[in-house]
Amino acid sequence: MPKYNLVSNVINQVDHKLGSNEPSGANKNILVAINGADSKLERKLSNIYSQFCKEYNFILGYSFTASRIVNKESINQILKPKHVFTEENLFDLNENIKLFDLLICPNITINTLSKVVSCNIDTYISNIIWASLYYDKPVYIDFENCKKFMSHETQNKFIKYKIDEKIKEIINMGAVEI
């Protein structure tokens, strides 16, 4: 599936899953989980914002690494979040999970993916993904970033196989690939 269809795929899946019984306007929130580096992240976030800003407010969740390496100021300007959560908010998970209607992971890493599918949920982002799946919230994940290490795809067939298996597992848990 071409990654250029990211936004339209999310919209179609969200519309289908949420249906027409959801509250309209500013009552709905999207948590965007930022996880590691991604050269296309700002473009992806701009597309997400332009498609969802009329119906949703945005909440940002940063992984430990992302909070230190991405341009948070630029991301905040793009999404205009009403809340921003970081690793320190791990202990507020029970309250955080109530604040959003759906989760979008535009740049999940293989580390986080592996943690969630192996039930090793020891970080804020792995916990928020796990809790969203556990409570049957819509979870949309772009797997492009987890297929790369230091911006390069592997030629090792077994590593590709292991990554594909983890992607299949999280999809079986309820996530939707975008």
Outline where the language-model segments fall:
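A cross-family phosphate/adenosyl-ligand binding-site feature
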Residues: 1-124, 129-178
